[in-house]
Amino acid sequence: MSNNIVITGQGIISAIGVGKEAVLRSLCEGRTGIGTMKHLNSIHHELPVGEVNLSNDEMKTILGIDRSTEISRTALLGMIALQQAIDESGITTLRQVSTDKHIILISGTTVGGMDLTEQYFGSFDQDDSHIECMRQHDCGSNTELMANHFGLFDECTTISTACSSAANAIILAANLIKAGQADIVVAGGTEALSRFHLNGFNSLQILDKNVCRPFDDERMGLNLGEGAAFIVLEREDEARRRGADIYGYLTGYGNACDAFHQTASSENGDGAFMAMTTAIEMAGLHPEHIDYVNAHGTATPNNDLSESAALKRVFKNQMPPVSSTKCYTGHTTSASGSIEAVISLLAMKHGFVPANLGWKNPMPEGIIPSMGIENHEINHVLCNSFGFGGNDSSLIISRFAATDKENAPKSNIGDITVLAQVEITDESELEEIRNYVKPLEARRMGKIMKSSLLSSLKALEIAGIDTPDAIITATAWGCLDYSERLLKQLQEEGEALLKPTYFMQSTHNTIGSNIAIRLKCHGYNVTYTHGEKSLDWAIRDAKLLIQSGKYKTVLVGVHDEVTPMMRSLMERLGIKVMPSSFYSKAIVMSCGR
């Protein structure tokens, strides 16, 4: 049985078009989609964005959804991209003739339904007129909405690793297919602009007031964007058996953690280097075989310097054409990995390198990006997605199959065992954190950051493990306290002088990346955020890693908190809430050999 993973469908919606044909035209014409915001209700019109040129009502009409139905923009964008990918792949017809195929949806997002939450946040303590929208606040509920709209999927889950979310969704898809746990997986990401998102990034002072200039010495920061993209993945033999069109092969991928800082990359780009080299090795390639690199290239001073260093370490004096396409779409954060995967597929099929728009001035220590190449044969594309917290992932998309050296999960790894398990639910237990961190650092940490780190360190101590090979985190809500603080500040003080600490601590992968930074763990790192199923998926992924034979020990954790306000909202909605204000459980899993 072939282990080659092929791409049989693709869908995309972004600032440069709805559908791959429109996106292709914009790329070939060198036309950016970054401009003045039209749909986002923000005072910051001085900040250009990569906004999708459709209102929510227009998207509902396209999808056949009643305009009175309240649906997050994140879910709507995802549905449109999903519809395209599903139609192109023909899996609707396949489902009609073959009900035994196991089809999974994996979506990457960080914002979730924040656009609805921030719109009605001020009314929650007054009446119940809009609290139903809180059912869409969490990331997992948005994926469920998308899955239910199509009625094709047997399972779905959500990954949130900031800007690498969609890339990690694609990696999980491949691992599930190789393990025989899925026949077809539709994977990608979706993200909508929100005031929370825009002001959070603005508080970090990394937004440019002009169109961004990746890898330029005078770059001033990124432009936020929105959009969604999904690709359909399956085994090559199964795709050929059903007569599906094959648009490319996913031949390699790598997931590594920079383990350096919550919002900054290391000077030498260690995580990026490891992600790229792992992907190239998996594909059975050498660096000189890469014909184009779709860089993460955010145009922030830190990222472009760090990514340049990593690229130079990988390619040395044989640098292939490199460009960032965020100068077209804006930085679509959690959706960027899949949006840029589709762009890479288009570049490969049509034989061109997209121009790195706006670049003029070389960085002293940077790479020289491509200003566009026509008639350029591309057999292998390296596509980079690097997120906050050092969650770095790379994909290799190829015109033809790899050497097929990636085999099925190893059968001789031994039984998977739990070496240690630590649960923390009481606030008094958190005092123990002072045994592991300095008092000043402990005072700066919120409850969930303390409980997640403490439970993890204690579990590893019991297991006799200094550093695990991988860290997998499960959280339904993430650092809810900091998200709520930022929302309150937006409501009470408006869109000015927001605290960067609140935003930095609000992303779901903050928990897992904080543990990795503490342990200097550069291995696989991912966060699941799919409600009550988050832990099940985390454990499932841990088993996949161990069964692959490449990982011996995996630290799995489930960490959540609930604020008084959220408890009130959930109780009013009739949703079960955990009894304590926080809950942490850390599990150390091993193959036992």
Predicted regions and their residues:
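Internal active-site segments that recognize and position negatively charged phosphoryl groups
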Residues: 172, 541
